[in-house]
Amino acid sequence: MSRKLCTLNFTLSGKQGSLVIRDIQLWSNRPTASKSTSELRGQFIQYVDLAKLPLWVRSTNMNTYRCYSTSATAQAYFKSKLRNANRGIVIELFDKVDQRSQEPAYLIIFRENTELNCFQVDLTMKHEFDGQVTKLKQDIGKTRASVSKEGSIDIIIQQSQQRKIGTKTEVYRNVHINDKRLQFNETLSKLILGGLRLRGISNSITDYQKLYKITFDAAEFTHRDELKRISMGSGEEVSFESLQETVETLLKLFTKS
């Protein structure tokens, strides 16, 4: 059951002064501990291309919130600025900080099909990368300080490089796995949307989103073995031709065309 979490107001600054976008309601389908709703305040930072965001910006288990507004100004603003499906609006929150770094928290508002959604930027992986870089610098500093005591600079440098290579290899491996899964999702989504358009199925049709979702889920199930191998780091990307054939078969089945 959906529940209203909070209301967001944020400020747009420009040459003509400031404009406040008001009454953006954030709703969640997940249960939360707090039963009271709050008001968040923030300011517009910039527009971003969602396809070019770093992988650490979004985690696989993060919350995505539905956004609604009864404000005509807010509705007109989002309609104008989010025409591009890959565009996002970055908002810096005044009243909320990242618990780990105590840095400002950020929301990204975007449009998915006909729905307006948002998510909070996940800084967890960024902090892990920063921590690894800091540790590597500390290790190198300790190594240099103890060169004269150890008496063998070659061994010390080799040990330091091995530690760096091991850490980088693990990070690159995880990033590579995430890239493959993200590419699968993006390709699958584009194929489904293209297939629906070719069949003359408009997103204004009542069952459009339902048809999109069941096709997406069925395609994931069809390629579950390949996705499992990808998640273990031992599989190749699902080929475009294979995924296209799967989508065509499913759409023929679901649309009876």
UniProtKB/Swiss-Prot annotation:
It is found in: Nucleus; Cytoplasm, Cytoskeleton, Spindle pole. GO terms for cellular component: chromosome, centromeric region; cytoplasm; DNA replication preinitiation complex; endoplasmic reticulum; nuclear envelope; nucleus; spindle pole. One of its GO terms (biological process) is regulation of DNA-templated DNA replication initiation. It holds the Pfam family Sld7_C. Keywords: Cell cycle, Cytoplasm, Cytoskeleton, DNA replication, Nucleus. The keyword Cytoplasm applies. The keyword Cell cycle applies. Its main location: nucleus. Present with 1690 molecules/cell in log phase SD medium. Required for the proper function of SLD3 at the initiation of DNA replication. Binds to SLD3 and reduces its affinity for CDC45, a component of the replication fork. Required for mitochondrial morphology. Interacts with SLD3. Belongs to the SLD7 family. This is Mitochondrial morphogenesis protein SLD7. It comes from Saccharomyces cerevisiae (strain ATCC 204508 / S288c) (Baker's yeast).
